[in-house]
A protein has these predicted regions:
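Substrate/cofactor-recognition hotspot
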Residues: 106
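Glycine/aspartate-rich loop-and-adjacent alpha/beta segment that forms the canonical ThDP
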Residues: 109
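Cys-dependent protein tyrosine phosphatase-like superfamily
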Residues: 1-99, 112-206
Length: 206
């Protein structure tokens, strides 16, 4: 049964008992929230941000509860570099289970990462399940203009990988410039701001 904190933090299991997704745990309830679900590791898609209170709180509470805290940088409005996706797959491989994937709202970057998790875990046969992670309900994925590249990325990756495991393809061959060209060739102009360079430094974005 979903509790109040599950609704507040947009919590859902990706794979029950193994991997979950959520929003930033504001309002000071992160500790009980992690304990309630038995979370052993937290993958933070907002990257390392020690100058912001939310990051310091999240890191402190994770350590206090024996939860491994892993920082990975993704940007929902900019196409990821290869090293960013490699870091995400490395996090999937090393994170103790059950793991929790979260960004700010648990809607966009988290949907993207959850989809990649399923394909990484189960192979390309999980493509439809992966795409379901972008559903408006219950995940509240309502992408803004420059976030509309997130879901098409799955089709791009499937075509480029040609059956290879997604992490292997990413490490060996993924090129954000090819993704940019692929999107533009298919009429997805304006669905992203560019290729990621560096974080903007907004506490709400990151």
């Amino acid at each position: 049964m979903r509790g109040p904190s599950d609704v507040l933090y947009n919590f859902h299991w990706i794979v029950p008992g193994e991997a979950a997704r959520a929003a930033q745990a504001y309002a000071g309830f992160l500790g009980p929230f992690l304990t309630r679900h038995g979370i052993k590791s937290l993958i933070n898609l907002r990257g390392p941000n020690p100058k912001f209170g939310w990051w310091r709180y999240e890191r402190r509470i994770s350590e206090a509860h024996g939860v491994r805290h892993i920082d990975v940088m993704l940007d929902s409005r900019h196409l990821p570099r290869r090293d960013m996706l490699v870091a995400l797959f490395d996090a999937f491989d090393s994170a103790p289970r059950p793991l929790l994937i979260k960004c700010s709202g648990g809607q966009d970057r988290t949907s993207f990462a959850a989809a990649l998790y399923l394909i990484h875990r189960d192979g390309w046969v999980a493509r439809e399940k992966a795409l379901a992670q972008f559903a408006r309900f219950p995940y509240l994925h309502f992408p803004k203009q420059h976030q509309r590249w997130l879901q098409p990325f799955i089709a791009f990756a499937a075509g480029e990988a040609a059956g290879r495991p997604i992490a292997e393809w990413t490490r060996d061959s993924y090129d954000p410039a090819r993704l940019k060209n692929w999107l533009e060739e298919r009429g997805h102009h304006g669905t992203f701001k560019g290729i990621f360079e560096r974080p903007v430094g907004s506490r709400w974005q990151w």
